[in-house]
Amino acid sequence: MSTKYKLRVTGECKQNMKLCKRRGLPMDELWTVVGKLLNGEQLEEKYQAHILSGDRKGQWECHIQPDWLLIWEIHNQELVLVLLNTGTHSDLFGKKYKKR
């Protein structure tokens, strides 16, 4: 099956994917989102996809579940989808993250 983008996954993301699997998170949900991104599809509103700012300017985040995130960026020149990280809010943003 041909996709719009090639997939690249960072080492940190691979490590955290294993952690998510050990936590019993439904990995098929993650791969459903990744499949949509690889095909250049817009994610449904339920995923709350949005661009990040600050240190993560140019990166995107979505909510696979309320406290399970995926962070990625797209390199259009290479047509590469780069999965940067996945995990809970505290996994990804540490102590500086505060729930509102």
Spans of features found by a protein language model:
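Generic alpha-helical hydrophobic packing signal
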Residues: 5-8, 61
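Enriched for short, Lys/Arg-rich terminal
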Residues: 1-6, 15, 22-27, 67-69, ...
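N-terminal first-folded block
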Residues: 8-44
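Flexible domain-boundary/linker segments
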Residues: 30, 47, 51-54, 69, ...
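A short, surface-exposed loop/turn module that caps and links secondary-structure elements
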Residues: 36-63
